[in-house]
């Protein structure tokens, strides 16, 4: 079984539609994504997944949202 990793991204989101778009693209990756936490107020997206960091980063960028930073926790 692959190890679940925790990634955190600082994503520019101005409304619930923005966070909804990010949530929608990440939800499509289930079951490889086991948990998604999005804070519109803090502009943070936490992803728990077995998928590579760069793959998740590209999926978030495809929503058209600016990703200011990201890291593995």
Curated annotation (Swiss-Prot):
Give binding positions for Cu(+): 15, 18
Q: Which domain of life is it from?
A: Eukaryota
Residue span, HMA domain: 4-68
Q: Which GO terms describe its biological process?
A: cellular response to oxidative stress; copper ion transport; intracellular iron ion homeostasis
Q: Which InterPro entries match?
A: Copper_transport_ATOX1-like, Heavy-metal-associated_CS, HMA_dom, HMA_dom_sf
This protein's GO cellular component annotations are:
cytosol
Listed GO molecular functions? copper chaperone activity; metal ion binding
User: Where does it live in the cell?
Assistant: Cytoplasm
| Keyword Ligase included in the entry's annotation | no
Quick check: keyword Transferase in the entry?
Answer: no
> What keywords would UniProt list here?
Chaperone, Copper, Copper transport, Cytoplasm, Ion transport, Metal-binding, Transport
Activity-regulation annotation: Tetrathiomolybdate directly and reversibly down-regulates copper delivery to secreted metalloenzymes.
Induction or repression: Expression is induced by oxygen. Expression is also induced by the iron-sensing trans-activator AFT1.
Q: What is its main location?
A: cytoplasm
Summarize subunit and interaction data from the UniProt record for this chain. Answer: Homodimer. Interacts with CCC2 via the copper anion.
Family of the protein in this entry: Belongs to the ATX1 family.
Summary of the function given for this chain in its UniProt record: Copper homeostasis factor that specifically transports copper to the secretory pathway for incorporation into copper enzymes destined for the cell surface or extracellular milieu. Shuttles copper to the transport ATPase CCC2 on a post-Golgi vesicle for eventual targeting to the cell-surface high-affinity iron uptake protein FET3. Protects against oxygen toxicity.
Q: What is this protein called?
A: Copper chaperone ATX1
Organism expressing this protein natively = Saccharomyces cerevisiae (strain ATCC 204508 / S288c) (Baker's yeast)
């Amino acid at each position: 079984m692959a190890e679940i990793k925790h990634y955190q991204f600082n994503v520019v989101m101005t409304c619930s539609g923005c966070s909804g778009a990010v949530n929608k693209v990440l939800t499509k990756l289930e079951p490889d994504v086991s948990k998604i936490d999005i804070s519109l107020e803090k502009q943070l997206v936490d992803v728990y997944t077995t998928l590579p960091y760069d793959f998740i980063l590209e999926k978030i960028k495809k929503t058209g949202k600016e990703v200011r930073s990201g890291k593995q926790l």
